[in-house]
Amino acid sequence: MGKYIVVSTTSNNKMVLNNISKILLEKRLVSCAQVFNIESTYWWNGDLVDDSEYLLKMKTRKDLYKGVEKIILDNHNYELPEVIFCDIDGYDKYLKWIDEETR
């Protein structure tokens, strides 16, 4: 298991994701946050839905995940928000930067 992760969540409201990003960055729980426009297709309440959404990706340390998750859930506009993470590895200096910028 890696020490570093990318956490992601989606929303139809960019301002919600920008607010979550700001809170997490100010609390130093993530080192970087990126918001992308996406098109999503998913099942919801028995219906197949096509939706324009935004994807928020954040880089952090795995030991900070529970704090990140709590802030996302406390500030999200969805009834059942996607909150997932993937282990990452990569360029040593970049990973060191994640360490330096998170608390």
Tell me what each language-model feature is:
Residues 1-103:
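Positively charged, small/polar-rich N-terminal and surface patches that mediate targeting and assembly
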